[in-house]
């Protein structure tokens, strides 16, 4: 048997076919160990051959062996790797591990020259090297790794003292095994309570192999429990206390060694393989070799136990050289080497690899908490802190965990909630910020600032809210600071905020007015009084209750200023008026002082003549009242209220806004648009009492008198309540739309009947051109005196002077002058007069290239830019006569120009030049100059002149070409003018005064303008849009046109830039004749 044991490896060289090797293993497996007993190792070996086909063994042996390795080492190495792949899931990982292990095992065995020694001797060397390898791994890495992970390049370190003792013990056991080649265990031991107990019955006695199986099962159970807990929560792996504690390992080894020494030579009974077969190197070795292996692994276990106590080694259990075997399926991800349940020591070696890999997440978790970056599993963003990572995850989850306790507002971030809570803090303190141009209200001043950007055409001042601070002064605290006033103003829920637009006429207001409050406060005081007469349905006492917002239609109607639009105005006029309004709105704050100073005069004059004050809106007209009779003033009440009211934009916008109230005024007033006319005409001689609520003029009187009587002399409220109601842009556009509809209907209805017949200033043609809101009486005087004859020019001048006595008069640019034809509004009377000529005068400036006709030269010049030509003559008569000349004038011109492209013919050079500029470059020279007296045709202007001078000398006619520059007569004359200075000098004569196009034809010659040395707009080039102010620049510019057209073909009149190009071009005309006339050009 020993001989067969030594010869068996010869049958398994690496180059032998895998089928033969498998057959040999199967046939002689029972006698492999030289004993007749079938130990669990032998049975396991046979089971491996049955379960795993030869294909797996082929792959393993190809990777693990080479032809040079000793036969003794090849077999255990290949089978050890083969057993690793018991699990199909771990097959690929195990194969990778085999690649690392095989070279190491082979290198350990290659050193042995005696390859024919018994297998146990070679195995001893392998196990000794394995123990050294495990010791080195435990000391170097501080964690258990199987030999698979150690690799062949592991530097061996001296084993510990305890490991060396175990190695010596294992070596002695191996030597005793060699002496007893055949042995059969006679006595069996049973592992019970940490000790090996002898069993009397041989049938039930345990061999060392079976004892190790028991130990393995116990270790497996512990590992399973540990692995289950590892999956649930990451924790540090602790070395197993059973069965390989420091005491149990040594006692087990002692018992096993004693058992081996007492082993008898009689074969023992065969033990069936366990459910999970124990497959390891022990399956191919004797029991002594197995004990040796167990000793080595026990040493590794102790080393791992010691290394686990080190702070840097959170990793698990004892090392072992053994290849991983089938691990009972634990929840943690199986590591590359997990095979069947091995002996206790083997299992301890296997699970270090899984445990090590499972423990890495726990390590990483602890590292993350200590500062390792967090990564978002959705977008992959790496975040440094856990709190930031949680905040980032809200983006993906959409969770808004922060709820405002006062409102439904929710947010994901705490800082957003804090900023939101400030809104409630402002509300609790009564702080509100309201826009003065629209109903927008915000509890944050910054939001109001942002909102004010929407009002691009209105005054944008961040101090609007602060300007309303004087409102608390109305309550009796004029000396409060701005902040205090602001707080009080907001406590009222925004009621005080709107005080600037409408305020009550209570004695508190008036008393505050006398207290020397800021001008803003003065502006607020009279607004409610101006808007509401005492006799009106809306009492002033009711005002404070609603003065937060005056959106009620009755309040709109209360301000009878809406009648200002009773006259006819078109949509365009209204839009222009709004544009003026927006522009003037920005100037309004600067005009506040003017209004305050002007109204004291009103108060003084009104105290003496109350009836007259009903129509007065401007200080000039009010001052003139004392010298004017009541009858003289009465017809102008409606007119003065409309035409003389000074509109500083806000007033105008207020009037526009109040137009919307016309639909609601049926229950409160007579129609405003009609009644003033009747009252002015019928009751002009009757003195109207201020208490009467008859018409528009009376309402205006009430507005102006009552509040002014209450006001002190030093303080006067503004003359109107500006923007008393907030209107948005959309509201204004709707009002304009309604206005346009009403205006269009009434304009068609009343223009024929009323405008020319009534004496009302609203419909007077002259005054209608002026702005209805004009404050300057001088502008209105001519129409007033013509219509009524009651106010003379000296009186109006006196009014202006008196108004200017210490009070600045309103500027003219604040006035508006609408056109009664098209509705366009102008800021100056002169502009309106010039505009009106467009509706009446004849369009005598006609375009010679299209049917367009203009009434002024500027418009025609602007139109001609479309045709790429400009008229530079300053003589309007010449231009008109030249453009409007008809074909009958051909008798005066000896020749005319004809276009070959479209057939256009004209005697005027300017028309022909501008016409040819409309064609493409190639077509611009397809023309001819024809004689009117005969059929002579040429393309050169000089030739036609010579022809006329020789053939038609008797006809004394001046031609346009004689009075025009040759370069302006035709583009081809540029070359002539450049080459002949005489022609250019003769062409500069100003014979007819009709030159329309003026250019300089020679670089040295000076351009001559027909009537002026320099036109209004400078020197303009006829060939392009170039305009300059000096002659030198103009001459330099003309060189561009002269040079580019210097070399012209006399056949096709095409210009070349260089003589060489012209010579080359002329060849195309002379080739058919066979000669080149290049010299004659």
UniProtKB/Swiss-Prot annotation:
GO cellular component, one term: ribonucleoprotein complex
Tagged with keyword Transcription regulation: yes
Known outcome of mutating residue 9 to A: Decreased interaction with RBBP4
Ranges for region Mediates direct interaction with RBBP4: 1-14
Motif RRK motif mapped to chain: 3-5
Any one Gene Ontology molecular-function term assigned to this protein's record: zinc ion binding
Region (Disordered): 1-77, 259-278, 307-348, 947-996
Cross-link (Glycyl lysine isopeptide (Lys-Gly) (interchain with G-Cter in SUMO2)): 176, 216, 226, 360, 372, 466, 475, 523, 549, 580, 587, 597, 634, 639, 658, 673, 704, 710, 742, 778, 798, 870, 891, 958, 1014
Key words of the record: Chromosome, DNA-binding, Isopeptide bond, Metal-binding, Nucleus, Repeat, Telomere, Transcription, Transcription regulation, Ubl conjugation, Zinc, Zinc-finger
Zinc finger motifs (C2H2-type), residue ranges: 374-396, 402-424, 433-455, 817-839, 845-867, 897-919, 929-952, 1019-1041, 1047-1069
Entry-linked SMART domains: ZnF_C2H2
Top-level taxon: Eukaryota
Compositionally biased intervals (Polar residues): 62-77
Cross-link named Glycyl lysine isopeptide (Lys-Gly) (interchain with G-Cter in SUMO1), sites: 673
Effect of residue 4 to A/K: Decreased interaction with RBBP4
UniProt feature, compositional bias: Pro residues: 327-344
Biased amino acid composition, Low complexity: 961-978
Family: Belongs to the krueppel C2H2-type zinc-finger protein family.
Alphabetical list of PANTHER family matching this protein: ZINC FINGER PROTEIN (PTHR24403), ZINC FINGER PROTEIN 827 (PTHR24403:SF62)
Function, as annotated: As part of a ribonucleoprotein complex composed at least of HNRNPK, HNRNPL and the circular RNA circZNF827 that nucleates the complex on chromatin, may negatively regulate the transcription of genes involved in neuronal differentiation. Could also recruit the nucleosome remodeling and histone deacetylase/NuRD complex to telomeric regions of chromosomes to regulate chromatin remodeling as part of telomere maintenance.
Assembly and oligomerization: Part of a transcription inhibitory ribonucleoprotein complex composed at least of the circular RNA circZNF827, HNRNPK and HNRNPL. Interacts with the nucleosome remodeling and histone deacetylase/NuRD complex. Interacts with RBBP4; the interaction is direct and recruits RBBP4, a component of the NuRD complex, to telomeres.
UniProt protein name: Zinc finger protein 827
């Amino acid at each position: 048997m020993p001989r067969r044991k030594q010869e068996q490896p010869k049958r398994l060289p690496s180059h032998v076919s895998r089928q033969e090797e498998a057959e040999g293993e199967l046939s002689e497996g029972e006698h492999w160990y030289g004993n007749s007993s079938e130990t669990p190792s032998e049975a396991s070996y046979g089971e491996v051959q049955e379960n795993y086909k030869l294909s797996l063994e082929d792959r393993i042996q190809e990777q693990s062996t080479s032809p040079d390795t000793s036969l003794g080492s090849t077999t255990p190495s290949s089978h050890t790797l083969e057993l690793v792949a018991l699990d199909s899931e771990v097959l690929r990982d195990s194969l990778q591990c085999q690649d690392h292990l095989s070279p190491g095992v082979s290198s350990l065995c290659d050193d042995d020259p005696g390859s024919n020694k018994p297998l146990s001797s070679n195995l001893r060397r392998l196990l000794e090297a394995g123990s050294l390898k495990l010791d080195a791994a435990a000391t170097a890495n501080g964690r258990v790794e199987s030999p698979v992970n150690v690799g062949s390049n592991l530097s061996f370190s001296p084993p510990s003292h305890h490991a060396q003792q175990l190695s010596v013990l294992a070596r002695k056991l191996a030597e005793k095994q060699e002496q007893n080649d055949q042995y059969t265990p006679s006595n069996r031991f049973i592992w019970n309570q940490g000790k090996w107990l002898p069993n009397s019955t041989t049938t039930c006695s345990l061999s060392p192999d079976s004892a190790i199986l028991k130990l393995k099962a116990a270790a497996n159970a512990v590992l399973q429990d540990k692995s289950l807990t590892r999956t649930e929560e990451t924790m540090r792996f602790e070395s197993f206390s059973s069965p390989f504690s420091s005491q149990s390992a040594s006692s087990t080894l002692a018992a096993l060694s004693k058992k081996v020494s007492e082993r008898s030579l009689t074969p023992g009974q065969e033990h069936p393989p366990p459910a999970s077969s124990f497959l390891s190197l022990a399956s191919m070795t004797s029991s002594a070799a197995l004990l040796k292996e167990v000793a080595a692994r026990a040493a590794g276990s102790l080393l791992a136990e010691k290394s686990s106590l080190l702070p840097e080694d959170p990793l698990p259990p004892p090392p072992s050289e053994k290849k991983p075997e089938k691990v009972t399926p634990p929840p943690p991800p199986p590591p590359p080497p997990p095979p069947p349940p091995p002996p206790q020591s083997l299992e301890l070696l296997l699970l270090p690899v899984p445990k090590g890999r499972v423990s890495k997440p726990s390590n990483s978790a602890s590292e993350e908490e200590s500062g390792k970056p967090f990564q978002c599993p959705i977008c992959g963003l790496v975040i440094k802190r856990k709190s930031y990572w949680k905040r980032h995850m809200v983006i993906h989850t959409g969770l808004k965990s922060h709820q405002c306790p006062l409102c439904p507002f929710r947010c994901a971030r705490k800082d957003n909630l804090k900023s939101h809570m400030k809104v409630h803090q402002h509300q609790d303190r009564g702080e509100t910020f309201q826009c003065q141009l629209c109903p927008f209200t915000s509890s944050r001043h910054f939001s109001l600032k942002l909102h004010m950007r929407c009002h691009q055409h209105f005054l944008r001042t961040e101090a609007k809210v602060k300007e309303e601070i004087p409102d608390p002064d109305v309550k009796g605290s004029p000396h409060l600071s701005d902040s205090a006033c602001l707080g009080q103003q907001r406590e009222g829920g925004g009621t005080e905020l709107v005080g600037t637009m409408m305020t009550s006429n209570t004695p508190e207001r008036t008393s505050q007015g006398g207290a020397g409050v800021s001008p803003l406060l003065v502006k607020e005081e009279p607004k409610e009084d101006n808007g509401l007469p005492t006799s009106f349905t809306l009492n002033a006492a009711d005002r404070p209750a609603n003065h937060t917002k005056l959106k009620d239609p009755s309040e709109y109607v209360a301000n009878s200023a809406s009648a200002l639009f009773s006259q006819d105005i078109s949509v365009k006029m209204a839009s222009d008026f709004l544009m003026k309004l927006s522009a003037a709105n920005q100037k309004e704050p600067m005009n506040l002082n003017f209004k305050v100073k002007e109204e004291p005069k009103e108060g003084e004059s009104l105290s003496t003549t109350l009836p007259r004050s009903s129509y007065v809106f401007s200080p000039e007209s009010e001052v003139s009242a004392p010298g004017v009779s009541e009858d003289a003033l009465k017809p102008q009440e409606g007119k003065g209220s409309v035409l003389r009211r000074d509109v500083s934009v806000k007033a105008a916008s207020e009037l526009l806004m109040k137009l919307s109230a016309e639909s609601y005024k049926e229950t409160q007033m007579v129609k405003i648009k009609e009644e003033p006319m009747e009252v002015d005409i019928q009751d002009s001689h009757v003195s109207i009492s201020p208490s009467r609520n008859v018409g528009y003029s009376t309402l205006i009187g009430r507005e102006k008198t009552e509040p002014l009587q209450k006001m002190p002399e030093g303080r006067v409220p503004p003359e109107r309540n500006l923007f008393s109601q907030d209107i948005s842009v959309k509201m204004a556009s709707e009002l304009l739309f309604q206005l346009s509809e009403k205006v269009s209907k009434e304009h068609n209805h009343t223009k024929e009947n009323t405008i020319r017949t009534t004496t009302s200033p609203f419909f007077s043609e002259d005054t209608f051109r002026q702005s209805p809101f004009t404050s300057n009486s001088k502008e209105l005087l001519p129409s007033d005196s013509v219509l009524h004859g009651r106010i003379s020019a000296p009186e109006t001048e006196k009014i202006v002077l008196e108004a200017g006595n210490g009070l600045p008069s309103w500027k003219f640019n604040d006035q508006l002058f609408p056109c009664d034809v098209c509705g366009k509004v102008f800021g100056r009377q002169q502009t309106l007069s010039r505009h009106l000529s467009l509706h009446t005068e004849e369009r005598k400036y006609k375009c010679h290239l299209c049917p367009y006709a203009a009434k002024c030269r500027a418009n025609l010049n602007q139109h001609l830019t479309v045709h790429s030509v400009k008229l530079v003559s300053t003589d309007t008569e010449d231009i008109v006569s030249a453009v409007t000349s008809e074909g009958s004038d051909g008798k005066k011109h000896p020749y005319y120009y004809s276009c070959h492209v479209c057939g256009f013919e004209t005697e005027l050079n300017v028309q022909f030049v501008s016409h040819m500029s409309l064609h493409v470059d190639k077509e611009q020279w397809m023309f001819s100059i024809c004689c009117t007296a005969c059929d002579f045709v040429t393309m050169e202007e000089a030739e036609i002149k010579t022809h006329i001078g020789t053939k038609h000398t008797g006809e004394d006619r001046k031609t346009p070409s004689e009075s025009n520059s040759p370069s302006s007569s035709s583009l081809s004359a540029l070359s002539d003018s450049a080459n002949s200075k005489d022609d250019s000098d003769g062409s500069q004569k100003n014979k007819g005064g009709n030159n329309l196009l003026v250019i300089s034809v020679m670089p040295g010659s000076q351009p001559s303008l027909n009537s002026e040395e320099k036109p209004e707009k400078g020197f303009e080039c006829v060939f392009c849009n170039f305009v300059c102010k000096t002659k030198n620049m103009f001459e330099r510019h003309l060189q561009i046109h002269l040079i580019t057209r210097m070399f012209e073909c006399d056949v096709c009149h095409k210009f070349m830039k260089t003589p060489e190009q012209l010579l080359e071009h002329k060849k195309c005309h002379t080739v058919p004749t066979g000669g080149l006339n290049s010299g004659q050009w």
